[in-house]
Regions:
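Iron-sulfur-associated redox domains of electron-transfer enzymes in respiratory
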Residues: 1-147
């Protein structure tokens, strides 16, 4: 499922996935042959709480149109409290994005377990659709790295 508009633009989406749950869910989606957009670039992280909000800002600076963080369900974290820390960090991130004028819809946090391959694929498809409707992220265009 590749979304391209009339000018040939395809959204660039970065997905930060927890090693213990969401990355395994992505693997299950792939091995089950469930489709999600090829323009979703997955980056494996040890735990969702290890995602520094600056990594999300850097992704936007480098040309991402949307960033999604996927982690274990609350109360089911491999590191016990990791996703509770994630909630606090992401609330800080959302206030930074508001300050910068970047639409909040361009960033999402989802809880996907290792057994939820179908949910992972559906989440990525839904997020890609949302980003496609929002269009290209031009807010940080002057800061983007040239290709």
């Amino acid at each position: 499922m590749q979304m391209v508009n009339e000018t040939g633009w395809k959204p660039k989406i970065v997905a930060f996935c927890c090693n213990w749950c969401s990355y395994a869910g992505a693997d299950l989606a792939g091995s089950s042959r469930l489709s999600y957009p090829a323009n979703v670039k997955i980056i494996r992280i040890p735990c969702s709480c290890r995602l520094n909000p600056l990594f999300v800002l850097r992704a936007f600076q480098r040309g991402a149109d949307g960033v999604i963080l996927c982690g274990c369900h609350p109360g089911d974290c491999h590191y016990t409290y990791g996703n509770y820390y994630t909630r606090r960090r992401m609330s800080l991130l959302f206030s930074m994005l508001d300050y910068l004028g970047i639409e909040r819809e361009r960033t999402r946090v989802e809880w996907v377990s290792a057994a939820e391959g179908a949910k992972f694929a559906a989440t990525m498809n839904d997020f890609a659709k949302t980003i496609h409707e929002l269009g290209e992220n031009k807010k940080l265009g002057d800061l983007r790295c040239k290709e």
